[in-house]
Amino acid sequence: MTLRNHQELLVALATLYFLATSLPSVSAHGPYAWDGEATYKFTTYHPGQNYKGLSNVKNYFHHLGYIPNAPHFDDNFDDTLVSAIKTYQKNYNLNVTGKFDINTLKQIMTPRCGVPDIIINTNKTTSFGMISDYTFFKDMPRWQAGTTQLTYAFSPEPRLDDTFKSAIARAFSKWTPVVNIAFQETTSYETANIKILFASKNHGDPYPFDGPGGILGHAFAPTDGRCHFDADEYWVASGDVTKSPVTSAFDLESVAVHEIGHLLGLGHSSDLRAIMYPSIPPRTRKVNLAQDDIDGIRKLYGINP
């Protein structure tokens, strides 16, 4: 279901149902979106050359933390871009080539969270002898020690269907047992610890949404409390998203569980099984915390199993 006239949209999109190709089709509505068909050309690009549009690619990698500085980006396939691609490939357990191969492009084009990937990697060994993949924000911010309850509220506009609110309430409940914090909905948006907003394109922070596909949502580190979802997505708030006739449908609860992890202080994980993995394909349900998520939140809040 969507925030627009979802019944009419469902009928319209269902008539256009088609099988997904090997590369997801993502419309280039914003600075961080990719066009599925046009992106194939990137496989022919080679370092040391100049290609129109690479400045936008560099901006994309800058937004996600792979290029730390933000000069006036040019269209040269230079060492900066090669380094960014290699780091990205390593982070996603891809073959490290420094080039835009098919698997790298497929990963780039998978819809994702808008929070940067490069923050702080713990690089610690867990009690099971495995290397952890969870990360934290800079300086490891968290909610104050001893916090047992946080309030959350939905923006008065746009008004949300109760199914949307229920999906997000379920998402909060996934974190309560491992962080020992209860989440209570309130009607006071201005005073709530966590403020939830569905918005389109530019919406008052430095991270505009890009229309359907691309960036699905983002949330800010503690104790900011802002949590935003792209209102232009086709959100499924109830029912089985895996059976949706809409190929671009996203499970709201799944994305919300991820964004709440950011609200609590977790960065992204390179563990594909983790809730905090940055990307999620359409028609996918993923709501249960993985061990990496649990280890990360316990490390941050000093909670023992």
UniProtKB/Swiss-Prot annotation:
Enzyme category, top tier: hydrolase
A Pfam match: Peptidase_M10
Entry-listed glycosylation sites: 95, 123
Residues given in the record as Zn(2+) binding sites: 113, 258, 262, 268
EC number: 3.4.24.-
Example of a GO cellular component annotation carried by this entry: extracellular matrix
Propeptide residues, chain positions: 29-133
Record-annotated active site: 259
InterPro entries in alphabetical order: M10A_MMP, MetalloPept_cat_dom_sf, Pept_M10_metallopeptidase, Pept_M10A, Pept_M10A_Zn_BS, Peptidase_Metallo, Peptidoglycan-bd-like, PGBD-like_sf
CDD domains associated with the record: ZnMc_MMP
Annotated family: Belongs to the peptidase M10A family. Matrix metalloproteinases (MMPs) subfamily.
Function of the molecule: Matrix metalloproteinases (MMPs) or matrixins may play a role in the degradation and remodeling of the extracellular matrix (ECM) during development or in response to stresses.
Protein name: Metalloendoproteinase 1
Species: Glycine max (Soybean)
